[in-house]
Amino acid sequence: MEQKDFIFITGASGIGKTTLAKGLLQHYRTTCIEQNMIPEFISRDGSEPMTGELEELTCWENLVAMLMCFHKLGYKNIIVSDIDDLRTADIPVVFKGKKYITIKLVSTDPEQIRKQMENRPENGLIDYELQEKMNAKNLKRDPLINEVEIDVAGKTSEEVLKQAIALIDTEIPLLEYDYEKPPRALFYSWVFANGLR
């Protein structure tokens, strides 16, 4: 089994990222970190209004710091989910030299993931138009460094988990590479100011 330092899970809202992360956590028995797992913050100085860009940047920088802390302490197969898709392009920059894999979940059956979103527990985001746009962008974009794609269409969550584990355990990540970030237009972002929704 090829242990990784980091396992990133990306994909459209409602496609099964959280379900996969929970399954991987049970399998690898390590740790799972989501970008939204940071302390509550309202502004930097008590008066400055919070912008979407600053909020996302704060979440991203905090996530990277947490991940590097766990890595420094010797954790392996650190599962990372729920990052802004635009940050997917930063993974090969920030984590170069580390053993990581990015699992991009897509669906060639938009109706399947629409139904998954419809049945989301805990009042998760329900926005079918955004989900469709996110998935379409992910289907069009070529894989990045150390990124693999799993089409969830027609698969149960158990089948997706099994496929993900097989990829994680066998894929050998590149540690050294040349990388040029793809155009921003190939990604989506929950930050309205990025203009990628």
For each predicted feature, which ranges?
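Conserved phosphate-donor/acceptor-positioning beta-strand/loop module used by diverse small-molecule
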Residues: G97-M117
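Glycine-rich phosphate-binding loop used to anchor ATP phosphates in small-molecule kinases
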Residues: T58-K96
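Walker A/P-loop
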Residues: T18
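Small-molecule kinase domains that catalyze NTP-dependent phosphoryl transfer to phosphate-bearing small molecules
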Residues: E122-Q163, I172-A193
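P-loop (Walker A) phosphate-binding loop of NTP-binding proteins
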Residues: A12
